[in-house]
Swiss-Prot record:
GO biological process: cAMP biosynthetic process; cGMP biosynthetic process; intracellular signal transduction; receptor guanylyl cyclase signaling pathway
InterPro entries, alphabetized: A/G_cyclase (IPR001054), A/G_cyclase_CS (IPR018297), Cyclic_nucleotide_synthase (IPR050401), MASE7 (IPR048432), Nucleotide_cyclase (IPR029787)
Species for this entry: Mycobacterium tuberculosis (strain ATCC 25618 / H37Rv)
Protein name in the entry: Adenylate cyclase
Membrane-topology annotation of the record: Multi-pass membrane protein
Segments in the Cytoplasmic topological domain: 203-443
Known partners and oligomeric status: Homodimer. Can also exist as monomer.
Amino acid sequence: MAARKCGAPPIAADGSTRRPDCVTAVRTQARAPTQHYAESVARRQRVLTITAWLAVVVTGSFALMQLATGAGGWYIALINVFTAVTFAIVPLLHRFGGLVAPLTFIGTAYVAIFAIGWDVGTDAGAQFFFLVAAALVVLLVGIEHTALAVGLAAVAAGLVIALEFLVPPDTGLQPPWAMSVSFVLTTVSACGVAVATVWFALRDTARAEAVMEAEHDRSEALLANMLPASIAERLKEPERNIIADKYDEASVLFADIVGFTERASSTAPADLVRFLDRLYSAFDELVDQHGLEKIKVSGDSYMVVSGVPRPRPDHTQALADFALDMTNVAAQLKDPRGNPVPLRVGLATGPVVAGVVGSRRFFYDVWGDAVNVASRMESTDSVGQIQVPDEVYERLKDDFVLRERGHINVKGKGVMRTWYLIGRKVAADPGEVRGAEPRTAGV
């Protein structure tokens, strides 16, 4: 399943915006590492609690039956009552440490089962509960205490063997009918406790796995928000140390908000951030619509690349369409003071190198002469225009209308002939210009 990128903040019915999903995801991820162990312990405690209450029901039922029928003597009923009370307080012992509650439960169960089996004989089936305890002991003490669990299971096996060889099938303490009833009830209740406990443990584990899957999806969304999907997948490969790719053809765009410094100094911080969030979120939607890749945002500068990391033959045309839509979207916006938001946009094309750099807060970036030229096209551009060099003009002239600006001096490149991108040609009439179609893009 593809991870969804964090986009524009959801818009409520009253026009207000909620915090973007990515902020919530970051907060959740920050809490997640400290929760996993605690949740594992809590699951084990819940399993022990449900097992203890099932045991209370079983031992309490036996005590009531023995008191009502008088079969087995009052002290057998007393053992069951004492055992049921002890089981009932087991959930209260979790606060004293991870092993106090399970060891109290298991120890009490072992003593009670052995005492009853010794008094009434093996035909009553009390020893079956030892087998249930051996099967459930890992769930109760935890997998991190495997050696202890094995030891407790061995004790259960030893007690079963001891009863078999040391105690007669029927000691005569209970009448034959009571022994038969005890055997049936013991068999049914032992199976019931085992099935119920395992079912509850598996259900709790399934819920925990669903939570982990949701956390994984949030992690994937955060990673997809930082890196292109294909790059993110390559970054997960354990043998991959460096990600660096050369592209013989790609197009680069830089856009800058004109007069941003003055706006920032005269606008409240919260209003400025909300404005930039709306603007850049709208641009992000356009990037996705055109199948491009946003590289970075630096203050009021927005950088987009086409043909990276997925090469495409129409990379220049796609970026030109995006530039026209971008200026159209910006024209629909007003800053917090109600002023228009003019842009300067520059495009360039050529070979580039792209890769992931940094060991902390790593990022995906693009380098090359085309990047430098696109930046110069933006910085030397006129307000509200999209400036391109001659190489871009040659690629766009058949499908777009461009107006020559002339020759300008570009730092590091000398004199360059540049053009203004006006719009896309209409197929029916090459002389007619079609500007960018109006797009709201969530603004």
